[in-house]
A protein has these predicted regions:
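N-terminal helix-turn-helix DNA-binding core of bacterial DNA-binding proteins
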Residues: 2-42
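Amphipathic alpha-helical dimerization/coiled-coil segments
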Residues: 82-105
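Short, hydrophobic-biased segments on the C-terminal half of alpha helices
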Residues: 47-49
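Basic, amphipathic "hinge/linker" alpha-helix immediately C-terminal to the N-terminal HTH DNA-binding motif
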Residues: 63-85
């Protein structure tokens, strides 16, 4: 099942992925596609945004004769994860509240 995702959730997923292991764009997109139907055209601007914000850095490495651009998390990226985790938890709590009937307007 695929769920709609916001760019902030994609940022969180990207940082969570590269926190565990350096990854290249296609690998990141395939991991996210396990739960969300995203396109590379959505992912790459977010990767660039994370790089510009200083949350990830990149390096190239050759693989089977081709260069791959790998993303690695920075200390600032690690520090940003708890904020994104809190945002995600709030979102989940609101969804659960609606489903359980405890959150209404």
């Amino acid at each position: 099942m695929y769920y709609p995702v916001s760019s902030i959730l994609i940022e969180f997923l990207v940082l969570a992925i590269v926190e565990k292991q350096d990854s290249y764009g296609y690998e990141i997109s395939q991991t996210i596609k396990i739960v969300a139907d995203i396109k590379e055209s959505t992912l790459y601007p977010i990767l660039k945004k994370l790089e510009k914000a200083g949350y990830v850095t990149t390096y190239t490495q050759e693989f089977q004769g081709r260069k791959r651009k790998y993303y690695t998390i920075t200390p600032a990226g690690r520090e940003h994860i708890p904020f994104l985790q809190a945002e995600w938890n709030t979102y989940k709590d609101h969804i659960d509240g609606i489903i359980e009937g405890s959150l209404r307007k």
